[in-house]
Swiss-Prot record:
One of its GO terms (biological process) is cell division. Transmembrane segments: none annotated. This is Kinetochore protein Spc25. Acts as a component of the essential kinetochore-associated Ndc80 complex, which is required for chromosome segregation and spindle checkpoint activity during meiosis and mitosis. Required for kinetochore integrity and the organization of stable microtubule binding sites in the outer plate of the kinetochore. Participates in SAC signaling that responds specifically to disruptions in spindle microtubule dynamics. The NDC80 complex synergistically enhances the affinity of the SKA1 complex for microtubules and may allow the NDC80 complex to track depolymerizing microtubules. It is found in: Nucleus; Chromosome, Centromere, Kinetochore. Component of the Ndc80 complex, which is composed of Ndc80, Nuf2 and Spc25. Keywords: Cell cycle, Cell division, Centromere, Chromosome, Coiled coil, Kinetochore, Meiosis, Mitosis, Nucleus. The gene is Spc25. GO terms for cellular component: Ndc80 complex; nucleus. Residues 51-86 form a coiled coil. It comes from Drosophila simulans. Belongs to the SPC25 family.
Amino acid sequence: MAIIMAESSYERRVKALYEKQIRMEALEAKFIKKVYKFNSNLLDVKEAACRHQRKVGKLQKVLMERREELDKRVSFIEELDRELEATKLRDLAMKDRIKQQKMLARQRKNEIMESIHTLSKTTETYINQDALPARVKGVTVLRGDKRNQLIPFDLKSTDVEGLDSLCQHLESLNVDIAQWQQLISLAMDVAMESRAPTTPPKEAANCNSIIEIDLTSPTCHI
């Protein structure tokens, strides 16, 4: 009887140990499964982190490129602003120079017109401005005690011989040739300037205040 009870107690202990081992193996398997799942999740997290890091790197690269492009555009705009300001200053300077040149031109023209008026009175010579610069047309008055003599002239502006002949003729009549030539030259300059930049007539293409006179035409008296 004692032997049977001893064996029964031994079986219970063995059975308890076996059941305990089974529970331990089940717990171990469950733990291993959890560890595997954790490692798998950790790997997924690491891969996701790597993908995110790569995206962040690409975004940073794009951001840096955009920033460099923006800096270049800002520099370009600043350069354009400087060029625009410089252009405005040049335009202002040019306008000022043009204004000064126009003022000087008006002043010079007024001085020339005054000189022409003075020389015209001094030499008693009156020029037809509308005929210039193609022709030199006018009349010189020689004052006399009893009567005045008119010497008309209607000349091309390119004949050297005509100029020489006219000068000799006027000089023989005691006309101040230097002042007379100066009058014609100034009148020619005014006519040339007033017609610039239009193309001058063919007759005046080589004009240098050179005139001619037809001495065969009769003089007039008053």
